[in-house]
Amino acid sequence: MEWVWALVLLAALGSGRGERDCRVSSFRVKENFDKARFAGTWYAMAKKDPEGLFLQDNIVAEFSVDENGHMSATAKGRVRLLNNWDVCADMVGTFTDTEDPAKFKMKYWGVASFLQRGNDDHWIIDTDYDTFAVQYSCRLLNFDGTCADSYSFVFSRDPHGLPPDVQKLVRQRQEELCLSRQYRLIVHNGYCDDKSVRNLL
């Protein structure tokens, strides 16, 4: 009889997982996304890392929209090289619009050559423009439509973090992206603020 209960338990676990659709095409994004309201400074509070070398902490992004409505971004943060050399580096991104105003193609590159470069999907999953934003990118799809290599940022307008009610909403969005418990917190300790004493690239 024990094996029967084991099968019942496995079936229950399987049905629980089946309730969440982890295909990238099923993920919802921000309705009627407004680039102009999104522009400005955002501080990365948490990050789900992709494969490759990217900014690791003290990440501050600046989004801007030009007179033609084209969005671009710059980001600065700390990177650790060779396991013991910390430097502050910059990345640049330009965005191409798609039919959905919250979904872009983002071409990005590091000002320093050792950083990753690419042309990824860049989706704004949710934002209230004034407090928080959740960004998502899938770089490689599995055959079943789920994501094999993704990254995601939780941004805040306030470098000191997000209020509790917003944190709860963000956790819900992370679960909807099938990325629950896969984020790490981003430290903001001013490492890249003092340009006179830090390594800059």
UniProtKB/Swiss-Prot annotation:
Lineage: superkingdom: Eukaryota
Pfam families in the cross-refs: Lipocalin (PF00061)
Cysteines paired by S-S bonds: C22-C178, C88-C192, C138-C147
InterPro entries from the UniProt entry = Calycin (IPR012674), Lipocalin_ApoD (IPR022271), Lipocalin_CS (IPR022272), Lipocln_cytosolic_FA-bd_dom (IPR000566), Retinol-bd/Purpurin (IPR002449)
Any idea which UniProt keywords this protein has?
A: Disulfide bond, Methylation, Retinol-binding, Secreted, Signal, Transport, Vitamin A
Binding of substrate occurs at: Q116
**Residues found modified as Omega-N-methylarginine:** R139
Give the matching PANTHER family.
Answer: RETINOL-BINDING PROTEIN 4
Instruction: Specify the protein name.
Output: Retinol-binding protein 4
Name the source organism.
Answer: Oryctolagus cuniculus (Rabbit)
Origin organism lineage: Eukaryota, Metazoa, Chordata, Craniata, Vertebrata
